[in-house]
Every structure is written in structure tokens, then in C-alpha cells.
Amino acid sequence: MKQIFIGIIRFYQKFISPMTPPTCRFYPTCSHYGLEAFQKHGAFKGFWLTCKRILKCHPFHPGGFDPVPDKKDDKVNS
């Protein structure tokens, strides 16, 4: 399932993004953030993180450096 989302993002990057001026307020860009989120966290959490990021990408948010959070280890280290 995550490969479908990654394919959609890559399609956007290759065919749609070059036709529009760069407007993302963040680094990495929202599409690169989405790719990394899906690769690190899988389909469900990657989708959630990408949606949250896209909703923050508007003129009233200052933007800046906003990396994908690291995957938390579910194991408890003793």
C-alpha cells in the first residue's frame, strides 16, 4: 500500500510540480517529506504525517526546517 502512495508522490514530483512555481515554506519540501514519511513509517502513519504537514503549508505558518520524525522503537530497553 505504501508503494501506491510513493508512486503518487513521484508522479506529482515528475509531472505536476515542474509546471508550478516553488511555493513550499518548508525544508524538505512537502513532497520530499511525504516520501520520507512513507518510507520510514509505512502507509498509515506516513499518510497521517504527510496530511499534517500539508495542512501546515500555508502563508500564515512561518515554515522552516521540519524533518520527518524518527521511528520510535516499540521495544523497552532494560
Curated annotation (Swiss-Prot):
It is a peripheral membrane protein. One of its GO terms (cellular component) is plasma membrane. The keyword Membrane applies. Its main location: membrane. Could be involved in insertion of integral membrane proteins into the membrane. NCBIfam families: membrane protein insertion efficiency factor YidD (TIGR00278). This is Putative membrane protein insertion efficiency factor. It comes from Bacillus anthracis.
